[in-house]
Every structure is written in C-alpha cells, then in structure tokens.
Amino acid sequence: MDTMTAEGLLLPWPDDDGEPFWEHARRGELRIQACADCGRLRFPPRPCCPQCGSFDDEWRLMSGRGRLWSYVVAHPPLLPAYAELAPYPVALVELEEDPRIRLVGTLTNSVRRPGAPWNAVPPGRLRIGAPVQAVFQVLTPEVTVVRWALCSG
C-alpha cells in the first residue's frame, strides 16, 4: 500500500481494528464500531468494549451529521505538500448519534465538493457548534477519506 498521494500528502495507515472504517468509507458510508453486546459506540476502533469488556462488535451506519466541536488552523512550516495548502482548518467533529464520538478531518465548503481544496473554508466562517455533514473524497483507488462539509444554518 502506498504511503503518500501523488501530491505528497500522507495516506492513512489502518491497523486491523480500524480497517473496516476505511473499507466502509471507500463505499461512501460512515460507519462506527459498536459493541454487539451492550451497544456502546466507540472510536477509534479497538478490540474490546470499554464499557462491558466484550470482544464482539458490529459496524453501525451513521447519518454523517455532526457539529464542529473544535478546530485548529494549520500554518507552515509543514511538510511541503501541506505547506502549499496552508492555512487550512482541521476539524474535530462530534457525531449527532453520540457526542462522545469525535472524528478529525479537513473541511470542505459544500457537500457537492468533497474534493475542494483544504483551504476552501475561510477560518472566519468557523463557529463551534456549527452543523457539518460527512462527505467522502477518493484519494487513491484504495483510500477514501471522510471530510466535513460546513452546512448553512
């Protein structure tokens, strides 16, 4: 598996527990690991439920809706490919289904533009609590990443 895109961006390197997350993302689905016994959602994926200790899990389909819980604006100096995109916001999003589940990703300015440049959302538009929607950007035939589209309202 490649470690970088043709543009020099780092690709995710999933472990065994996280591979299903990336597999579902390739299909355009946001799925989160859940305990098959007690139902607790967990992210990042891990082998054992932190609530009941069960090793049985399932991957539940999420709505993709969430809220901006926090963000940071990345500035140079960074790796060369990232420096060319900076400054750009990186979001921490809490999912609508469970606010304890938070995912990191870059933002896009429209659900219709999953491949928009990372700096497409001006940092001045960002507000904690702003609604976002998951979108999926294909980076390589093997890797699709979850990004977050800033929603109006």
Regions found by a protein language model. Give the residues of each.
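A broadly conserved sequence feature marking short terminus-proximal activation segments
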Residues: 1-30, 143
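Well-ordered alpha/beta subsegment
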Residues: 3, 100, 104-153
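Residues immediately within or flanking Cys/His clusters that coordinate Zn2+
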Residues: 29-32, 45-46
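Short, cysteine/histidine-rich loop/knuckle motifs that typically chelate Zn2+
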Residues: 34-37, 48-54
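Short functional micro-motifs and their immediate structural scaffolds
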Residues: 43, 56-58
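A short, structured loop/turn motif at beta-sheet edges
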Residues: 60-65, 96-98
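Glycine-rich active-site loops that engage anionic ligands at enzyme catalytic sites
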Residues: 69-123
